From Swiss-Prot:
One of its GO terms (cellular component) is nucleus. Residues 258-427 are annotated as: Disordered. This is Cyclin-L1-1. One of its GO terms (biological process) is response to salt stress. It comes from Oryza sativa subsp. japonica (Rice). Belongs to the cyclin family. Cyclin L subfamily.
Length: 427
């Protein structure tokens, strides 16, 4: 039993030799080739999707962890690789849409199999099946991981180790070796510190850079010599392998370019063939024999129905079948009449519904028209009141001016009359 926890997903050599794929009859070479093939798919798809290297590294670690618990026979390496990329993008905060994942893996498979790249319609049944498989495989991944997807990569230790050892020229070489180590099972066998020390040692051996031996430099980084030697041995074995090729071990069709065999067979089968197979009649391969078998199966079915109907009806002692035939014809006519009446009722109900909808629409339209008329009348009343106020104010001003002029005139006349009176008095 493999228990999953944070930073404890590490297996022994015995557990790797007793993996589920080995139990299903897959040898070590085939399992190694399939692991490398799946990691190559993840790396190539990450480049096409423009993902950071951290996403591809996390996806490859999840890929190896999953196949430590499940077999290549029961889970497709292509579908699992696609789901690992999809899940790792979410974990590393660089998500990609499922549509882009499926299209990229579809194009990669067309290239690898040297077939024409065809357009993948996102509204087709094939695309919906691929998306369903992608989501289902992601659920399997999370279930087997126990929803613990924490991954620690050796890359973050490389820069610190080389800075301490004062060998910055080995950085790029060690980084490349760390990327290549993710295609092997080193990520599920050793801690990231040990893998980082191993790739630093391999890079130093390649470039001929001496490392301190007294005391041993790896003791400072919590590593041992045996682990470093094993890391170098696994990397050397990886570079000796040929280019990874796909090996068909999955039971069902896992192609991104073709449909499943079960779907194609189900689409090819007709109802008549299923009837013939249920009755036990073999279906020949040639077209003429198929037609004869289908016709025979249909006639047998009609005869059986007729026999069943005859058994249910009472038979006359003299063997007269006229009334039975009449009863059958009457029943069929009554059934036809009933079906016609049902259709009429349905059509009437539809007409009523449509009329009700139309009436509702008309009533709503009338209400809206009435509201508009009310608003218009209210606006007109406001305008009238405003005009009336303006007129009344104008009239008052005019009246005031008139009153003022009359007073002025009265004063003028009164002043003249008083002067005349004074003159007469003086005279």
């Amino acid at each position: 039993m493999i228990y999953t926890a944070i930073d404890t997903f590490y297996l022994t050599d015995e557990q790797l030799r007793d993996s589920p794929s080995r139990k299903d009859g897959i040898d070590e070479a085939t399992e190694t080739a399939l692991r490398v093939y799946g990691c190559d798919l993840i790396q190539e798809s990450g480049i096409l999707l423009k993902l950071p290297q951290a996403v591809m590294a996390t996806a490859q670690v999840l890929f190896h962890r999953f196949y430590c618990k499940k077999s290549f026979v029961r889970f497709s390496v292509k579908r699992v690789a696609a789901s690992c990329v999809w899940l790792a993008g979410k974990l590393e905060e660089s998500p990609r849409r499922s549509k882009h994942i499926i299209i990229v893996f579809h194009r990669m498979e067309c290239r690898r199999e040297n077939v024409p790249i065809e357009h993948l319609d996102v509204f087709s049944k094939k695309y919906s099946d691929l998306k369903h498989d992608l989501v289902r495989t992601e659920r399997h991944l999370l279930k087997e991981m126990g929803f613990i997807c924490h991954v620690e990569h050796p890359h973050k230790f490389i820069s610190n180790y080389l800075a301490t050892l004062e060998a910055p020229e080995l950085t790029q070489e060690a980084w490349n070796l760390a990327n290549d180590s993710l295609r092997t099972t080193l990520c599920v066998r050793f801690k990231s510190e040990v893998v980082a020390c191993g790739v630093v040692y391999a890079a130093a051996r390649r470039h001929g850079v001496p490392l301190p031996e007294d005391p041993p430099w790896w003791n400072v980084f919590d590593a041992d010599e045996a682990g470093i030697q094993e890391v170098c041995r696994v990397l050397a074995h990886l570079y000796s392998l040929p280019k990874s090729q796909y090996i068909q071990v999955y039971k069902d069709n896992d192609s991104f370019t073709h449909r499943r065999t079960s779907d194609t067979n189900a689409s090819k089968e007709s109802p008549a063939t299923t009837v013939a197979s249920d009755k036990g009649t073999p279906v020949p391969s040639s077209s003429s024999q198929e037609k004869d078998a289908l016709i025979k199966a249909g006639s047998d079915k009609v005869k059986e129905k007729g026999d069943d109907d005859g058994k249910t009806l009472p038979s006359e002692p003299n063997g007269k079948e006229g009334p039975a035939v009449n009863l059958k014809s009457e029943k069929s006519e009554s059934n036809v009449d009933r079906s016609r009446e049902r259709e009429r009722d349905r059509s009437r109900g539809r007409d009523r519904d449509s009329r009700g909808r139309d009436s509702d629409r008309d009533s709503k339209g009338r209400d809206s028209d009435r509201e508009r008329e009310r608003d218009r009348e209210a606006d007109r009343d406001r305008q009238r009141r405003h005009h009336s106020k303006d007129r009344s104010s104008g009239y008052s001003d005019k009246e005031k001016s008139r009153h003022r002029s009359s007073r002025d005139r009265g004063d003028h006349y009164s002043s003249h009359s008083s002067r005349d009176k004074d003159r007469h008095r003086r005279q």
